[in-house]
Amino acid sequence: MKTFTKLLALAGLTFITMVSCNNNSESQKADIVLENIFSRKSVRKFTSEPVSDKQVETLLKAAMAAPSAMNSQPWRFVVVNDKEKLASMAELLPYARLDTAPVAIVVCADLSGYSKFWTDDCSAATENLLLAAEAMGLGAVWTAASDEERSAIVKTALELPETIHPLCIVPVGHPDGEFQPKDKWDPSKIHYNKW
């Protein structure tokens, strides 16, 4: 009977340890994700170190993991890694920060299908891309391309089909310098149950 009691106590202790470790593991996962979100910053200056094709693919996989209305996945991406193309676009789009970026990812939407919420869907994809870049030690910044003037420049430069509309350009590279995230927490912007 003593042996059975000891075994039962040991089994109980093992179970408690497993549950505790599992909870600790979940807590660690949450901490890692939250740390990545709070560490994300806009990087506008890059070293000459290239971004590998594998890194670009990982960024695009992260972007495509975003939610979309009715699972429509309207996003399309144009990867620009040609130095001359980047330089010519940088001249026309000075706010796109393409002058030192080794690669830029243009986030677009295909408006030929269900596209009522394309800006929401492509924005979610862009945020995933930015968070993935942060997690990978890369720098990136969201630069607008959806207004009429910038959109026309991007459409012409990249020879986009009529149904493809750019949302933003995300220059990506290895940060040149120390960039710090901004603390944007502001409880005064939060309302509960009514304004």
Residue ranges and their predicted role:
Residues 2-8, 15, 19-195:
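Acidic, surface-exposed loops and disordered segments
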